[in-house]
Amino acid sequence: MAREPEEEETVRPAAVVRRCPRCPGWPGAPRPPLWLLCLVACWILGAVADADFSILDEAQVLASQMRRLAAEELGVVTMQRIFNSLVYTEKISNGESEVQQLAKKIREKFNRYLDVVNRNKQVVEASYTAHLTSPLTAIQDCCTIPPSMMEFDGNFNTNVSRTVSCDRLSTTVNSRAFNPGRDLNSVLADNLKSNPGIKWQYFSSEEGIFTVFPAHKFRCKGSYEHRSRPIYVSTVRPQSKHIVVILDHGASVTDTQLQIAKDAAQVILSAIDEHDKISVLTVADAVRTCSLDQCYKTYLSPATSETKRKMSTFVSSVKPSDSPTQHAVGFHRAFQLIRSTSNSTRFQANTDMVIIYLSAGITSKDSSEEDKKATLRVINEENGFLNNSVMILTYALMNDGVTGLKELAFLRDLAEQNSGKYGIPDRTALPVIKGSMMVLNQLSNLETTVGRFYTNLPNRMIDEAVFSLPFSDEMGDGLIMTVSKPCYFGNLLLGIVGVDVNLAYILEDVTYYQDSLASYTFLIDDKGYTLMHPSLTRPYLLSEPPLHTDIIHYENIPKFELVRQNILSLPLGSQIITVPVNSSLSWHINKLRETGKEAYNVSYAWKMVQDTSFILCIVVIQPEIPVKQLKNLNTVPSSKLLYHRLDLLGQPSACLHFKQLATLESPTVMLSAGSFSSPYEHLSQPETKRMVEHYTAYLSDNTRLIANPGLKFSVRNEVMATSHVTDEWMTQMEMSSLNTYIVRRYIATPNGVLRIYPGSLMDKAFDPTRRQWYLHAVANPGLISLTGPYLDVGGAGYVVTISHTIHSSSTQLSSGHTVAVMGIDFTLRYFYKVLMDLLPVCNQDGGNKIRCFIMEDRGYLVAHPTLVDPKGHAPLEQQHITHKEPLVANDILNHPNFVKKNLCNSFSDRTVQRSYKFNTSLVGDLTNLVHGSHCSKYRLTRIPGTNAFVGIVNETCDSLAFCACSMVDRLCLNCHRMEQNECECPCECPLEVNECTGNLTNAENRNPSCEVHQEPVTYTAIDPGLQDALQQCVNSRCNQRMESGDCFGVLDCEWCVVDSDGKTHLDKSYCAPQKECFGGIVGAKSPYVDDMGAIGDEVITLNMIKSAPVGPVAGGIMGCIMVLVLAVYAYRHQIHRRSHQHMSPLAAQEMSVRMSNLENDRDERDDDSHEDRGIISNTRFIAAVMERHVHSPERRRRYWGRSGTESDHGYSTMSPQEDSENPPCNNDPLSAGVDVGNHDDDLDLDTPPQTAALLSHKFHHYRPHHPTLHHSHHLQAAVTVHTVDAEC
C-alpha cells in the first residue's frame, strides 16, 4: 500500500572506512602507556563502529513499530480495505465551465449588495426632493444616544440599535442641512434583516453629516470629518489622481508654520487610496524625497497603506532649514516625477494630475522678482510638456496671523499659473487648468480645508459603484470591503451611500473551493491585486488585510506574465502553459499525478465577475488525478451518529477529556465550514439544538427523504464511509496496552468532515484540512507522517501526531485519489520512550555520551533528550536539528542531494522564509563526512515508510559547532546570500518590494510564494459550573505510579525530578498530575492560561533562550569568537552606512541585545554542567527558539520599515527586556507560560468603524478578547524597536 515519493534523487552515503589510527611505536613501542592508550582508543572506535553499524537495523525496528501503531492503534489498514471496497464515480474538472458557474455565484452575492446600495441611493435622492418643500433636518447625535436604546450584537461585535441610525457632524454643518437619516431607518433595517454578511450602512452628505446604521455610541473627541476619508474621496472623484505634495521648510518658515504644513501633508495622505499615486517632496535650498524606497526619487508610488506609512514617517521627520527656499527647484522636480510616471504607465485620459504646494510664499529679498519669474517659467515649460494638464493648489502658511500681500499674490499666481503677468510666453495654445489658493493658520480645520482638496478637481459625474480593497473592521471581527455610490440631484452632489460587506462571505466560494486535488482558484481585481489565493489565510481568521500584492508574485512560474496580461485584458478566456518541474510551485508538486516527468501543464481559465472590478480564475494542474466521489452509501447499522455539540445535546455520559467536553461512548462527528454550501453562514450563526438534530437526521437517513440542511452533496457519504472505523476504535479503547499514551484518534476528509474519538466538542472555526498533520500526510501520500511536538489545545500538554492518507483505491503500484487522512495523537514523552525502549544503544551508557533523536523531513525534532529534559529545556515546539544538534546539521549539509535549503516569499507578513527539506529517498545511512570532527560521530538514516529519520550521536568530548541563529527573533543573520552548505536555523528576511511598481527586487522575484500557514486553533470554553461537575474521561492515577518507567509519557502525568527553583534535583522523584509539575518541575506554570502554578517568572521561562552549559574553556573560545564576529560586523556595518546616503529604520537601529543577560543565564547553569551531561549535548551553539508569529502586526511593521534597496547585516537589533511601544494583542495559551500579558487596550473608536480602518496611522489594531485559546503557540518577547527617523 505504501508508495514512496519518486521525485527526489536517491542519496547514497559517503563510504566510511573504519580503521584504527596509526599508533606511535606500534609494534615494539618503548613506551607501553602510549601503546596501551592507543589500544583502548581502537577498542572504543570499534565499539562505536559496531553501535553505528546497527542504525539500519534500528531504523527497521522503529519502522515496524510505526507500522504497528498506524495499523493497530489507528486502523489505517482496516480503513483502506473499506475504502477499496466502496463504489466511486469519476469526475474530471473542466476549468472553463467551472469558472463560469463560480463567477455567477460571486456575481449574485455582489448584486445583493449593489441592490442595497442602489435602494439606499434612491431613498436619499427621493428624500432630497421632499426636503426642498419640507426640510428634513432632524439630527440623532451618535455621541448622545442613550445606552438603553442599544444591545450587544455578535455580527457587529459591539452594542448597537438595529432600529435607528445616528449622525456624526462636521464642524461646518449648517443647522438647516439636508439629513435624510430618519427617513432611511426602515429601509436600512430591512436591508440588514434580508442580507447575510452585511455590516455597517451609511450616508455621507456633501454638507458634512455622516449617518450610520445601526446606531452605535462612539466616544466623541471633537468634530468628525468624513469627507476627507478615502472612501468618500474615491467615490465622488473615482478617477485616478497623481499627486505631488511639496512642503516648504526654508529659512523663512517658522516652526509653527512648518507644523501646520506637516499636519496638512498627513491629512492629504490619509484622504487617498491605492488607486491614486503620491509623492512628497521637501524644498529649501534643495529638494529631498523620502529615502525609504529608492523608487520614490524617480516615480510616484501607488498610495498603498505601506507607501502612506513611509511617506508619513518622512513628513514627521522634516526639520527647519537655514537656507532660503528655491521654489523653482521644487516645482521642477515635481513635474519630473509626474512626467516620468506618465511615461512609464499607460496614460489614462481621465487621470487628474495635481501639485499641492504648502508654503509661506516668501522669496529672497535680493532677487524676489527673479525668483518668482523663474518659478513660473519652470511651471510654464514643464506643464507645456504635459499639455498643461497639471493643476496647482497652493496653501499659504500664515505666520502668527500675519501674511504679506506679496506672498499671497505670488502663491495665487502659482495656483492660477499666471505666467503672462511675468512676461513669459505660453509654450502651448492649450489652456491651463487653474487651481486655487487657500490660507492656513493654527485655527484652520485641516481636514475640512486641505482634506477637501479634491473639490478643485473636475467632477465627471461618474455614477458607478466603487469597490474598496479589504480592510480591518475595527469594531468587529475579520475584514470588510465597502461598496459605495454617489448621490445626485440633477448636477448637485448630495453625498455618497455605502455598505460594508464581510469579506469572508463574499469570498467563501473561492476560499472553500474543493473541486479536485489538482485544482484551485484565486480572485484578483482589475489592477492585478490579489484578494484570495490558496496561500492566503482564510478571511474569517484574518485580523489585518493582506498586503496589496500582485498575482504574479503568487503564481511565480515562467510564462505566467503573458497569462496575467490576458487575464487583465480579456473578460473571459483560458490558457495552458508548460512549467519545468525545477521551476514549479510547492502546491503544484503536491498535485502532480506523474512525478517522474520533467515538465507539467498548468491550465488557467478566468472570467470577469460581471458588474464588479473582480476577476475569478480556476487553475488546473495537468494531467490531473480524476476525482473519485463516493456513490450513495448507507450508514453502518451498529454505529450511532453523534454530532460534536455535546453541550447542546445534553449527553448523559459526558466527561472532560482534559479541557474538552467529551464522551467515551462513541466518536463524534464535526462538520467544519467547508462541509456547508454556505460556509460563512455556518460560521456567523450560532448552532442551535434544532439545527444539530436536523444535521443528525439527514446524515443518518438511509431513505434519502429528509431535506438537506445546507450541506455539500458529498458530505453525507463521507460521514457514512468514516463510520466504519468506529468499532475498531472502540475495541482498541478497551484492549490496547497503549491507551495510557494516546490522546485521541481521528479521521478527516477533504470536505472538512472530522470524526474523532474520544468524542469531543470542537471549535466551530476548526478546519482539519488546514492543520499540519493533514497537510503533511497529503504531501507524503502512502507514508506514515510525523508532526509535532505542539501544545495540544485540548489540554493534554505536548503531543506528537502520526497521520496517514487513505486512498480511493490503493494497490501496490499506485495510490489513487486521497479521500481521507487518519491521525492519532501521542504524548511527546511516549515517542522518546519508544526510542529508548527499541534502541538499547541510546541507553547503554546512561545517556552520558550517546544521544538518539527522530526528526521529520523538514528537520524539526520529534524526539530528542532536550525535549523531555526538565532542567532548563522544557518541551518546545518547532525545535530544529540546527538548534539542538549543530554539529550534525553542519555535517549533513555537505552530503550531496540529501538536504535542500528552500526560500519562499510570505506576503502575509512580507518576509522571505528560509527552510529545509530532507530527501526521504535516502538509501543506507549517513555519517561524518567532514574530517576533524573527531569528538562527535553520528549516524543518520531514514525510518522506512515514514517521512522521518532516526539519528544517533556519540560525543566523546566537547566540540564547537556553529549554526547561525538569532537569539531573540527569527531574523536571518545574513540576508544577502544563502549558501546550501552553510548551517543556519530556519529563519526569515525582510521581503524587499519596489513600492512604486509593486515588483520585488530581482533576486527575490524568483522565489515561490509560501504555502498557507497553519491556522491558529481555538478550543471552545465550557461552562465553569459544568467543568467542576464533570469527571475526567481518563484517570491515569498518576499518584499510584511509583516507577519512572511506569509514569513517563503517561497521559496527564509528569515524573517530577526538579524542585520549584528550577535547578535543584529532588531527593525522591515521584509521579504527579501534569498541572502540579509541568515539564517535571514542581509547581511550574502550565502553558495553559487557566492552570497557573506557583513558580516565579524566572523559572517559567524554563531557560528557553539558553544553550547547553558552557565549560570554562569552551566558554572562553565562544566569547572570543563572538567578540571577533561582532567587531567585524560593527566595522563592516559602519563602512556600509557611510557608503549609503540614507538610513533605514531597521539597518540603523541600535545594537541593543543584552548579551550580558544571556551570559548570566549561562553562568547559572555551569554549576550543574556535570550532572546535566546525562541528557544534554555539550556541543556549543547559539540557538533561536522563536517560532514564527504568523500575523503579528509588530513583525509586519518591523519589516515594512525597510528600504527596497538597502542592505541588512542581520544581527538582531532588539532589546528583549523592554516593553514594546505597541505591544501586540495576544491571547495565546503559551503567553501565560512566559508571562507576557494581554495588551488589549479597550479601543472605543472616535471614528465610525467602516472608515476608522482607513486611518491606520492613527489607530492601533484591536481584536476583542474571546474566552478561547489559540493553538499556534509562539514564544513572545516584549521588545522595543529603536527606529531612526528617515531624514532625507
Curated annotation (Swiss-Prot):
The chain crosses the membrane at residues 1110-1130. It is found in: Membrane. The keyword Cell membrane does not apply. Residues 467-546, 786-867 form the Cache domain. Gene3D superfamilies: PAS domain, von Willebrand factor, type A domain. It is a single-pass type I membrane protein. May regulate voltage-dependent calcium channels. Belongs to the calcium channel subunit alpha-2/delta family. This is VWFA and cache domain-containing protein 1. It comes from Mus musculus. The gene is Cachd1.
